[in-house]
């Protein structure tokens, strides 16, 4: 698959992204590398913790394939710092409190929470090529086996 599966607004690549550890980056700063961006609802919740740990366990394989990983939620940098320290994540988490990145990737969805309709992050992952094209998207992600599936897709795309 070489065609983009999601067209991102050009401005998305220059959005300032606040990372765990207090640094900033942009998507453009990752040009030339494969990039896995996974969106998750909330730090330190069971599913989000498992997903992060699964990506972290496979980080050497993602590195070997030339990919960087960014996890994204609406939590604060401080929350991300605590989450990373507690779980030992070796990749950065993006604090998207203003939802700019979430909206660019269209992951803010209406969800049913305790009988009420609320807007929240739909667990989603996107694989960006070194040229910045979204070449694969996973929406409504089920955590079990997901990081393995993303790694397999990365390897398949990298061979093309």
Swiss-Prot record:
Q: Which cysteines are joined by disulfide bonds?
A: 48-84
Gene3D superfamilies of this UniProt entry? Glutaredoxin (3.40.30.10)
Does the entry feature the keyword Oxidoreductase, yes or no?
A: yes
Substituting residue 48 to A results in: Abolishes catalytic activity
Which of UniProt's keywords are assigned here?
Answer: Antioxidant, Disulfide bond, Oxidoreductase, Peroxidase, Redox-active center
Alphabetized GO MF terms: thioredoxin peroxidase activity
- Residue ranges annotated for the Thioredoxin domain, each copy included: 4-159
Which reaction(s) does its UniProt entry say it catalyses?
a hydroperoxide + [thioredoxin]-dithiol = an alcohol + [thioredoxin]-disulfide + H2O
**Miscellaneous remark of the record:** The active site is a conserved redox-active cysteine residue, the peroxidatic cysteine (C(P)), which makes the nucleophilic attack on the peroxide substrate. The peroxide oxidizes the C(P)-SH to cysteine sulfenic acid (C(P)-SOH), which then reacts with another cysteine residue, the resolving cysteine (C(R)), to form a disulfide bridge. The disulfide is subsequently reduced by an appropriate electron donor to complete the catalytic cycle. In this atypical 2-Cys peroxiredoxin, C(R) is present in the same subunit to form an intramolecular disulfide.
Please report the name of this protein according to its UniProt entry: Peroxiredoxin Bcp
Look up and give the organism this protein is from. Answer: Xanthomonas campestris pv. campestris (strain ATCC 33913 / DSM 3586 / NCPPB 528 / LMG 568 / P 25)
């Amino acid at each position: 698959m070489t065609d983009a599966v999601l067209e991102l607004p050009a401005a998305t690549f220059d959005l300032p992204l606040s990372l765990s550890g207090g640094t900033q980056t942009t998507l453009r700063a990752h040009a030339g590398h494969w990039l896995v961006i996974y969106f998750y609802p909330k730090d330190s919740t069971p599913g989000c913790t498992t997903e992060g740990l699964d990506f972290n366990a496979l980080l050497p394989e993602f590195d070997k394939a030339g990919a960087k990983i960014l996890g994204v939620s609406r939590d604060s940098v401080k929350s991300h710092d605590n989450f990373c320290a507690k779980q030992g994540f070796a990749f950065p988490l993006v604090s998207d409190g203003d939802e700019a990145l979430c909206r660019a990737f269209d992951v803010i969805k209406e969800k049913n929470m305790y009988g009420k309709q609320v807007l929240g992050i739909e667990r989603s992952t996107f694989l960006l090529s070194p040229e910045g094209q979204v070449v694969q998207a996973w929406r409504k992600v089920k955590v079990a086996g997901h990081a393995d599936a993303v790694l397999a897709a990365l390897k398949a795309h990298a061979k093309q």
